[in-house]
Amino acid sequence: MAERVAESEKITINLGHVDLGHIDLMVQEGFYSNRTDFIRTAIRNQLERHADAAKQAIARKRVELGLRHFSREDLEEVRATGQMLHIRVLGLASIAGDVTPELACATIGSIAVLGALHASSAVKAALLDRIR
C-alpha cells in the first residue's frame, strides 16, 4: 500500500482578541470565507512580499524546495558508495517507512528541514542528534 503524505501541516497560533475580532469582521463582511481563508491569504501575501529574499536564501543555503522523499533503495545506493547525505529541504522531507534506523544512521549525516519531516518514530529517534 502506498504511503499517504499529508498535503499540509496543522499549526496553532495565539491571537489577541482585537486581532481575532478584526478577522471575524472581515469574514462577516464577505472578504474571506472563514478565519482559515484569511490566515492563509495573509501568509501567502507575506511570502510573496519576501519572495526575493527567500529565493536568495534558498540559493545561498543550497536548500531543495518542495517535497523530497528518500526511499530505502535511495539510501542503500548511498550506503554502497560510502557517502553520507546532508539533507536540506524547504517543504517536506520524508523517509520511507521501511528504512531502518541503522540504514538511516549509516547514510544520513545531517538533516535541516524548514517545514516538516515525515519518518518513523524509530528513525527520528536514531537521527535526533543530526536533525537541525
Model-flagged regions — what are they?
Residues M1-V18, V27, T36:
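Short Lys/Arg-rich basic patches
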